[in-house]
């Protein structure tokens, strides 16, 4: 007799369904695939981190020249 554990099978399928939904929704914004959105996020993160470091160095430089 075939017996299925519904909760266990649902948990196994959740990541697959989640990835599919994320991929479909990602393609709706500017037509980029999910993989391309990771590139966009990484580039944006790098630019923000460089900007934060530059601002931090400017603040340190202003404090040093004030004294």
From Swiss-Prot:
Family: Belongs to the T7likevirus holin family.
Gene Ontology biological process terms in this record: viral release from host cell by cytolysis
Segments in the Periplasmic topological domain: 56-67
Transmembrane region(s): 37-55
The entry's keywords: Cytolysis, Host cell inner membrane, Host cell lysis by virus, Host cell membrane, Host membrane, Membrane, Signal-anchor, Transmembrane, Transmembrane helix, Viral release from host cell
Bilayer disposition of the protein: Single-pass type II membrane protein
Molecular function as annotated in GO: pore-forming activity
One Pfam family in the UniProt entry: Phage_holin_2_2
Lineage of source species: Viruses, Duplodnaviria, Heunggongvirae, Uroviricota, Caudoviricetes
Protein name as catalogued: Holin
A cellular component annotation (GO) from this entry: host cell plasma membrane
InterPro entries per the UniProt record, alphabetical: Phage_T7_Gp17.5_holin
Major site of localization recorded for this protein: host cell
Record note on quaternary structure: Homomultimer.
Job description of the protein: Accumulates harmlessly in the cytoplasmic membrane until it reaches a critical concentration that triggers the formation of micron-scale pores (holes) causing host cell membrane disruption and endolysin escape into the periplasmic space. Participates in determining the precise timing of host cell lysis. Participates with the endolysin and spanin proteins in the sequential events which lead to the programmed host cell lysis releasing the mature viral particles from the host cell.
Domain of life according to the entry: Viruses
Organism: Enterobacteria phage T3 (Bacteriophage T3)
Cytoplasmic side: 1-36
Compartments in which it is found: Host cell inner membrane
């Amino acid at each position: 007799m075939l017996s299925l554990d519904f909760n266990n099978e649902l948990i196994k399928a959740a990541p697959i369904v989640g990835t599919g939904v994320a991929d479909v929704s990602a393609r709706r914004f500017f037509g980029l695939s999910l993989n391309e959105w990771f590139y966009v996020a990484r580039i944006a993160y790098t630019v923000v981190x460089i900007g934060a470091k530059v601002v931090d160095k400017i603040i340190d430089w202003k404090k040093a020249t004030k004294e």
